């Protein structure tokens, strides 16, 4: 009996031991898997992403990300970890066509907008998201209203990462591209990646040619009013025309007619560094300054009388003027000259709260009130790229963001209100291969605002075609006497991007002319005040209360000292 029970007990004990061993082997795997799922950094919405992030490339070697840009964007894998995005087939036409941008956790979302009446290509075929592949041949012409892309768009198989040939000439008005042609077999490499084709045609026909340079990460090409963009690192410009943030109640001040322009462009200079990865950021900057001795509270200048151009951001350490970050979004692009770390943005050589910029001797401090947090002020110029292009067909566009307040982008036009558009607050390098009326000569009067002197290049005819392919817009003053010079027209009025990439309406608070002598004596309002109410750029980079002067409730007009 005993001998007959022993094997049975042993057998039972053996089974129990085996069960324990199996549980010991299986449970840790299950727990590890569940813990790994819970703590998967790829699912962290606050994760800082980069183009070569394994979360984007994929861990299994199959299709890693499916580009869902709005309509018929898709992912076509020709090999392991092939990120095939015929990016931004969400290029529906009109005033809110979206182009793809990075969005933490999901790879990208829509945030840029194309303006004008059709024919915009913020994505589509020729969106080359691998370092391999020169796209040659005709990539399918678009005509008619449907704008479906057909034909052979050329297989991408080289290593140059350039696009040659006519990259999708558009002659229709709808121009949505399904991006269904063309095979991609390259790996995602950030050094020569092209997410969204930097050609944008809004209005007139004409082919656009894209020649991205090496290192031009995430190019987009939303431009305005029938302008064909040619340049691998072109920017997208969203504006609120007629929004009027002012630094003081001075009629016809440099800020009395300027729009708010934010930057969602891709250009990252060769000297640009990012802490923790390339997490894109859009920033709204407000300028503060005294205008020089005896002009406190007036529009700032370069140390002379009021009404002159304010200093660029490069001169923030000089006696007059300074810039402050007043809003922004972590759902859009990082601009040149900036770094991102710990949820904050920093300029190259940023200030800390131990050494902040506090205005200048004899000039008022910044209007933000108490001591600032790190990353709130800029010491270098995040607007003008530090690297240019020697190619005659591709110049980087250097608009990073609009220094609002006194100075910056100003209204200009041909004399009619409808044709007014902003001049540039800093130098802009723009290439146009075929455009309609993207540039307008300025009349130069105080009612029209200032205009810009041309740099290299010229404007010919009514089509505003650029003979040399390059125009550099200089800083605008408050009352320019030089007429006939180009200004960039921005006819649309949505602000750039909400959390879901949808355009935000312009708040009615800023649409009227402001100043003590304006009709109805409408007070000028600070963009900081508008941002705290409307939040047009998504999540703010800092507490809105910090950006308001002490003791002043939200919603009240701001007077800047």
From Swiss-Prot:
Renumbered to this chain, region (Disordered) spans 41-275, 415-466, 536-561
Which compartments does it reside in? Secreted
This protein is called Corneodesmosin
Q: Which GO molecular function annotations are given, in alphabetical order?
A: protein homodimerization activity
Functional note? Important for the epidermal barrier integrity.
**Where are stretches of biased composition, namely Low complexity?**
61-99, 128-207, 224-248, 431-466
Biological process (GO) annotations held by this record are: amyloid fibril formation; cell-cell adhesion; corneocyte desquamation; negative regulation of cornification; skin morphogenesis
Recite the UniProt keywords alphabetically: Secreted, Signal
Compositional bias (Gly residues): 116-127
Q: What domain of life? A: Eukaryota
**Composition bias, kind Polar residues: at what positions?**
415-430
Point out the signal peptide segment: 1-32
